[in-house]
């Protein structure tokens, strides 16, 4: 695992875009996350598309999760959210963007089918991730199996409450999601986790320096052969080995890719 520390959230977004751009140019399969943390990165990639001609025409993309019970065109579905925030502003083909089928009659089978679809596409080359204050990634809350596949998960009551602002009322918030599991996420060839803000500092410390444990689902990144964690200074405040991470990056060989 490589820990990369930048001064501001804006610099985190720029660094992430720098890492993603070669993958885009090579026609890689991208793993996309929703949420506020990746937005700056998506905006920078959109800017490079508009101003520098960065093309996504040869890319495929897979979303991490989807609400169960919402149609894809619902304004709050994660498919519609990623369209609104990112993919409708670039030249990726609509049919090249996939999300779990939250309307399937058999949700268990839909999870298995999604994992199979990812495998049939050759796997995800680089997966963008955020992290929750409790260490969750995707909707893999504390207690999730470290080798779990794409499956149904029940939202935490706090998540339902937090997401109510996007709906007419809390009663309208779906209680279930279909999410890539930690095992599915681990199959991506490169994991790129972004975190900003002091409220993420404890979770970042747990994922990077704590034990690998279901209590901090993101700690499974310690087992991955190519995981990059980009954080701002505020999110780095709890790291015991912060100075070493800075030293290691400054002395990174020129040939070594992030």
Curated annotation (Swiss-Prot):
Molecular functions (GO terms): glucosamine-6-phosphate deaminase activity; identical protein binding
Record bears the keyword Amino-acid biosynthesis: no
Catalytic activity: alpha-D-glucosamine 6-phosphate + H2O = beta-D-fructose 6-phosphate + NH4(+)
Pathway given in the UniProt record: Amino-sugar metabolism; N-acetylneuraminate degradation; D-fructose 6-phosphate from N-acetylneuraminate: step 5/5
First-level EC class: hydrolase
Gene3D superfamilies to which the protein is assigned, alphabetical: 3.40.50.1360
Tree of life domain: Bacteria
EC number, UniProt record: 3.5.99.6
Active site positions, chain numbering: 65, 134, 136, 141
Keywords recorded for this protein, A-Z: Carbohydrate metabolism, Hydrolase
Keyword Hydrolase: yes
One term under GO cellular component: cytoplasm
InterPro entries: Glc/Gal-6P_isomerase, Glucosamine6P_isomerase, Glucosamine6P_isomerase_CS, NagB/RpiA_transferase-like
Pfam families in the record: Glucosamine_iso
GO biological process entries: carbohydrate metabolic process; glucosamine catabolic process; N-acetylglucosamine catabolic process; N-acetylneuraminate catabolic process
Family: Belongs to the glucosamine/galactosamine-6-phosphate isomerase family. NagB subfamily.
HAMAP family: GlcN6P_deamin
Function: Catalyzes the reversible isomerization-deamination of glucosamine 6-phosphate (GlcN6P) to form fructose 6-phosphate (Fru6P) and ammonium ion.
Protein name per its UniProtKB record: Glucosamine-6-phosphate deaminase
Higher taxonomy: Bacteria, Bacillati, Actinomycetota, Actinomycetes, Mycobacteriales
Gene: nagB
